[in-house]
Amino acid sequence: MKNTLQFHHAALRVDKIDTAVEWYVATLGAVVCYQDDTWALLEVGKISIALVSPNQHPAHIAFACENAGEYGTLAYHRDGSASVYIEDPFGNTIELVETPPGTEC
């Protein structure tokens, strides 16, 4: 299961996606890459931050990899990506993401 991993994003839990997006855009100059009712992906400088609804997604760190399916069953998302969530031995959630070719953020 050797894979080349690259940092993809850190996910922060927020109660109101719209309000959080507005704050990150106005305060930090974030660029919105994707947004729906349960999460948003923002680019702040060279870092991506996911803002996630507490009842929909866990707080986590994500890595992009070519074959996330080797770590478990892929879940397919509305933004075109697919991922697997795993936990380290200490209960921290890690997401392994496969992004479609040509994804901007």
Indicate where each model-derived feature is located.
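Short, isolated positions in well-ordered beta-strands
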Residues: 48-50, 94
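Vicinal oxygen chelate
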Residues: 17, 55-105
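Short secondary-structure boundary/capping segments
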Residues: 2, 32, 40-41, 53, ...
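Conserved acetyl-CoA-binding loop of GNAT-fold acetyltransferases
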Residues: 26-33
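Short glycine/proline-centered loop/turn elements that form peptide/ligand docking sites
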Residues: 19, 37-40
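N-terminal beta-strand motif that seeds the catalytic metal site of vicinal oxygen chelate
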Residues: 1-21, 48, 59-61, 103-105
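Conserved active-site tyrosine of GNAT-family acetyltransferases
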Residues: 20-25, 91
